[in-house]
Swiss-Prot record:
Family: Belongs to the universal ribosomal protein uS12 family.
Function according to Swiss-Prot or TrEMBL: With S4 and S5 plays an important role in translational accuracy.
Protein name according to UniProt: Small ribosomal subunit protein uS12
Subunit structure, interactors included: Part of the 30S ribosomal subunit. Contacts proteins S8 and S17. May interact with IF1 in the 30S initiation complex.
């Protein structure tokens, strides 16, 4: 506990909130180029092969981004759009790739939550 004199000499510092997605630099999305596309396994209670991509952003950062949905067409040198949003069971993956934007195709067979996966409305018969 500081004394009054100590507080007069040097006041308390306010704690600044840290960003959950620092590589975006306060932008809603960023464009980047895939350097590696691979699969990883999640943390302990879960088991799967999660698809991720290492992306070099236009501002020079290189981040890991999750590829949501079933199936994808991404490979090295694909240009993608990333947004914030971590994947809870993949340590170090703090970004999501936006499906249906730039080189990333939408999920073809998606019927529900289509806007989140860049899927077009199916033709009515």
């Amino acid at each position: 506990m500081p004394t009054i004199n100590q507080l007069v000499r040097k006041s308390r510092k306010t704690v600044k909130a840290q960003s959950d997605s620092p590589a975006l630099k306060n932008c809603p999305q960023r464009r980047g180029v895939c350097t590696v596309v691979k699969t990883t396994t999640p943390k302990k209670p879960n088991s799967a092969l999660r698809k991720i991509a290492r992306v070099r952003l236009t501002n020079g950062y290189e981040v890991s981004a999750y590829i949501p949905g079933v199936g994808h067409n991404l490979q090295e040198h694909s240009v993608v759009l990333i947004r914030g949003g971590r994947v809870k069971d993949l340590p170090g993956v703090r970004y999501h790739i936006v499906r249906g934007a730039l080189d990333s195709a939408g999920v073809a067979t998606r019927m529900q939550s289509r806007s989140k996966y860049g899927a077009k409305k199916p033709k009515q018969k």
